[in-house]
């Protein structure tokens, strides 16, 4: 699932292609038609479904559509690789312990929107990224993996975001590779 540029999605696809991650992407779901993630998936020959959040106003209804789609595809694990929507209990319960998110902070610090801006505002010297299991409480699920990124003198939002994203591209495939033996047991 993705909403934006799709760089984390493509990092997963590349990890699969190189054999770093033994998995298969059954489809990408985007909620922002024409976004970079959709373009990347189409270029890679990966099926894409578009569930435009502007046309489905009710978040629970959107999440219900996601669950139906994933079950029809017999999806075992759902990865939110830049999904910029808060999910409801419908999706969380439908994929309990099998819904994974990557967040641009060292959780539990800087949960929610604009974690990078929050870190800069707080003046921390280290931030990073976290892969975690999604629960009903925003960015509060069990942590699977983290990577630290120093905040350098003169960092602005764009520079820090770029360095965090570089770590996300490494961390997400690694965390999924470590998790894979356990996800079929749930």
Language-model region placement:
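N-terminal Rossmann-like dinucleotide-binding module
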Residues: 1-36
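Conserved beta-strand segments of alpha/beta enzyme cores
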Residues: 24-27, 47-49, 98
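Residue-level detector of anion-binding/catalytic polar loops
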Residues: 47, 76, 125
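Short beta->alpha connector loops at strand-helix junctions that form conserved
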Residues: 49-54, 102
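N-terminal glycine-rich "phosphate-gripper" loop used for MgATP/nucleotide binding
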Residues: 30-31, 54-55, 59-63, 73-89
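Donor/substrate-binding cores of folate-linked one-carbon enzymes
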Residues: 15, 81-184
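N-terminal beta-loop-helix "entrance" segment that forms/cooperates
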Residues: 34-46
